[in-house]
Amino acid sequence: MSDEESGISILRRVSALVLAAIVAAGCLTTAFAPVAAADPVSDDRLVDVRTVVPDAVVDLRYATTDNFVGEQLYPTGSRCLVHESMAHGLAVAAARLRPERLVFWDCYRPHEVQVRMFEVVPNPAWVARPGTAARSHEAGRSVDVTIAGADMGTGFDDFTARSRAYATEGVNAAARANRARLRDAMQAGGLSVYEGEWWHFDGPGADQPRPFPKVPLP
């Protein structure tokens, strides 16, 4: 074999080894790549809460008739969607509460649902007046939550003074302690309670006006 032929043979072997290494690396990258979150909603940066709190109890009351309107306002099979800026905080809160579980009563709320709610209860003290921009639930930046099985003193959407986050009159000591535990866990994740409702927590920038998300719930 001439020197030229020998050089070509060596070059071919080296090329084959490099190609094999590239293929192997690609396989490893694929095998260990992070798994994409289920059902991400990238356009409006909303995510399914179960992708960040896998053991969440999702009990969307507005997907049933068990709510103050008495109507099913969300389609059957609706997801609990939150803005991605809340994801880390909710994961922290859930970790603080385990083995108890977070129950989600409401997350992202479409604008037309907010309009219907205000038609039924046109009192801004209890139902936010629909505006021309998305805030809070309408932007996916607020959640309504409780602790599974815990006595909290009232049910969801109880339009009485006992629903206030720091209420004492008519709220027993155990319920006050449970509300405090929920607040502490959520605050550890950077989420703040709305003083008018012990179950309502806001994420970063919840009060800032934003475009309405165009996101399907189911």
Predicted segment positions?
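Extracytoplasmic cell-surface/polysaccharide-interacting catalytic and binding patches
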Residues: 2, 20, 26-107, 117-218
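Short, well-ordered surface patches within globular domains
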Residues: 113-114
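Segments that shape or occlude catalytic/ligand-binding pockets
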Residues: 110
